[in-house]
């Protein structure tokens, strides 16, 4: 059955999973979700122009445009694996606690100066998104950049069985999704699934030389592989260190845009956050490895402008908004606050939303953020039930963004620099609607 589906996929190489966004002559996969069951929309998909439908609905067994399978999701994943094995191009896998999407976009921007690049759309980085990304790669593409996310143990290793990365980047490892991982050690081991996959095929790892954990893990895992097999040709390209790195650089200003020194030049970017220096150096390192010129790398970095509520600078009247509310965890929240305090601005305010998926660690991690803001004497407005449990007389707490919005709209702030950060589920974007 898989071979038949793949044969048709080669003729109609577009996948659809949502009848509201169906593409004519695509193959519709009837995926199940918490709120929907695609198997209920077979006829609708065909009426809207799907060429074929992959479904678990046995009543369509004899339909000439339907493939009836036991498990649609597994079929999608196997199809992606088969397609990946037919591709003869570099596939760069990216994971990490923070910075995955920004790094992915920077790498794509840099490599696109020279190559036809396909990369993960948005943050489709899970057990559905990674197969869809692989299946979107065509024979015209020369390099693929695949983002991989995880919220439970061993998930990255699973995603690598679809992507088969030849090159790998772990941006960093911090506390996130602790509800699913249960411990920091489990987070480390899960992220290292990418290193293991690349090492297995003697690929190339791009490693932040300042991150001692990543350096140790990369070297140790290569040595372990060599002892087991007797051979391993995995390369490590270090970036961000002073001792003969592939690429290094430094932050020279944050106003709030980030200015960096790289290739003996000052470059002003369109993103904020000193923490983004590592992401830029990673992209530059990969660009140089693949033969992109330094001038092209600089052009790509300067022209990259985020529009995804990550490290984004906006204006609200004459106030400057640091919009970083796509997601949040303890590590990224701490980094955002510390970076915010480095910005050259006279009047600063922080609007911080809850951090989700922390399980039993939630109360302690939220309290650490409140204490950090108090240490900086930062005027802060905390939003969400997790922060509200820590309510005291000296800090501003609001149970929801809706309760804060009316207050926010009547602040009449003037020439303030405002950090807005929190988990997606807090819906901080409502403040600007």
List where the protein language model places each region.
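N-terminal leader/targeting and accessory segments in enzymes
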Residues: 1-78, 82, 272, 341-345, ...
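Residue-level signal for inorganic ion chemistry
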Residues: 26, 45, 79, 94, ...
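Acidic, Mg2+-coordinating active-site environments of NTP-dependent enzymes
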Residues: 55-63, 169-320, 345-346, 367-379, ...
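Phosphate-binding loop of NTP-binding sites
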Residues: 74-205, 209, 213-232, 263, ...
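ATP-dependent carboxylate/acyl-activation modules
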Residues: 94, 308-310, 425, 429-430
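Peripheral docking tails and interdomain loops at the edges
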Residues: 397, 416-433
């Amino acid at each position: 059955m898989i071979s038949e589906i793949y044969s048709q996929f080669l003729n109609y190489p577009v996948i659809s999973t949502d009848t509201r966004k169906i593409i004519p002559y695509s193959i519709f996969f009837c995926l199940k979700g918490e709120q929907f069951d695609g198997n209920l929309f077979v006829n609708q998909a065909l009426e809207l122009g799907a060429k074929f439908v992959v479904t678990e609905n046995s009543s369509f067994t004899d339909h000439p445009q339907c493939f009836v399978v036991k498990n649609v999701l597994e079929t999608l994943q196997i199809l992606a694996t088969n397609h990946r094995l037919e591709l003869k191009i570099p596939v760069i896998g990216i994971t990490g606690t923070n910075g995955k999407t920004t790094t992915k976009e920077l790498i794509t921007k840099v490599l696109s100066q020279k190559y036809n690049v396909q990369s993960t759309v948005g943050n489709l980085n899970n057990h559905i998104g990674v197969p869809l990304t692989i299946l979107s790669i065509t024979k015209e593409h020369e390099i693929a950049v695949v983002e991989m996310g995880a919220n439970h143990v061993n998930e990255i290793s699973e995603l690598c069985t679809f992507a088969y990365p030849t090159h790998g980047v772990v941006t960093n490892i911090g506390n996130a999704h602790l509800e699913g991982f249960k411990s920091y050690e489990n987070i480390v081991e899960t992220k290292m699934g990418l290193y293991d996959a690349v090492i297995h095929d003697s690929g190339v790892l791009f490693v932040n030389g300042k991150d001692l954990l990543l350096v140790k893990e990369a070297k140790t895992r290569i040595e372990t592989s060599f002892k087991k097999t007797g051979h391993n040709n995995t390369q490590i390209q270090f970036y961000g260190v002073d001792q003969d790195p592939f690429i290094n650089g430094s932050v020279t200003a944050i106003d709030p845009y980030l200015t960096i020194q790289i290739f003996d030049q000052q470059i002003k970017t369109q993103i904020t956050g000193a923490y983004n220096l590592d992401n830029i150096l990673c992209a530059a390192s990969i660009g140089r490895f693949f033969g992109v010129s330094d001038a092209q790398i600089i052009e790509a970095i300067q022209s990259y402008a985020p529009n995804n509520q990550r490290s984004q600078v906006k204006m609200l009247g004459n106030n400057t908004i640091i919009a970083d509310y796509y997601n949040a965890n303890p590590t990224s929240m701490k980094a955002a606050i510390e970076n915010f305090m480095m910005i050259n601005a006279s009047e600063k305010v922080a609007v911080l939303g809850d951090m989700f998926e922390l399980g039993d660690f939630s109360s302690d991690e939220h309290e650490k953020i409140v204490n950090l803001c108090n240490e900086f004497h930062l005027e802060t407005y905390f939003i969400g039930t997790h922060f509200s449990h820590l309510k005291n007389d000296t800090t501003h707490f609001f149970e929801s963004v809706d309760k804060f919005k009316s207050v926010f709209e009547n602040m009449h702030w003037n020439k303030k620099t405002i950090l807005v950060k929190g988990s997606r589920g807090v819906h901080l974007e409502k403040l600007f609607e």
